[in-house]
């Protein structure tokens, strides 16, 4: 007979909140892909590709925040540890997604790594790092934490 207390009814099981976090990440990936397409079609011709990539980072961060804001209650992660676990999931999935997408589009490893390297003007690493805290920040601002 187990003496462990059952989880509260309002908190999804560990796998459930991560599964919901994954579904929210799919929305982030879709919106970020559209954001990248729009940047390439409209911003890059005006500013040049390198500057357009830098200028677009705040918009990408805003997309992640809005998805976190809209989905954090549904995801159901309430503790700081679980919220950061969702953020870590988003971060790892998005870094992998970006690298696979860039490789499939024929970008060199030098170009991909430059996007993440602030010494070379890349801000993508900073934008990606914000993903780690976005679920926690959204929960806090919504009064769920």
Language model: regions and residue ranges:
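Short, Lys/Arg-rich, polar N-terminal cytosolic tail immediately upstream
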Residues: 1-15
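N-terminal first-folded block
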Residues: 17-58
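Hydrophobic alpha-helical transmembrane segments
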Residues: 18-22, 26, 54-58, 83-88, ...
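Membrane-interface helix termini and inter-helical loops of multi-pass transporters
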Residues: 38-47, 106-116
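Internal alpha-helical transmembrane segments of multi-pass membrane proteins
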Residues: 49-54, 76-92
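Short aromatic-rich membrane-water interface segments that cap or initiate transmembrane helices
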Residues: 50-51, 113-125
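Hydrophobic cores of alpha-helical transmembrane segments in multi-pass inner/ER membrane proteins
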Residues: 61-69, 124-138
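Membrane-interface capping segments at transmembrane-helix boundaries
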Residues: 137-145
């Amino acid at each position: 007979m187990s003496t462990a207390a059952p989880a509260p009814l309002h908190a999804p099981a560990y796998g459930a909140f991560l599964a919901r976090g994954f579904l929210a990440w799919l929305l982030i990936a879709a919106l970020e892909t559209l954001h990248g397409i729009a940047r390439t079609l409209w911003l890059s011709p005006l500013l040049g590709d390198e500057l357009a990539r830098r200028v677009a980072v705040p918009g990408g961060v805003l997309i992640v925040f809005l998805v976190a804001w809209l989905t954090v209650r549904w995801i159901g992660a309430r503790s700081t540890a679980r919220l950061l676990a969702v953020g870590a999931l988003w971060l790892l999935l998005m870094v992998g997604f970006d690298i696979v997408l860039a490789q499939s589009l024929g970008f060199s490893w030098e170009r991909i790594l430059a996007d993440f390297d602030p010494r070379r003007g890349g801000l993508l690493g900073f934008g990606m790092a914000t993903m780690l805290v976005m679920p926690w920040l959204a929960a806090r601002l919504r009064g769920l934490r």
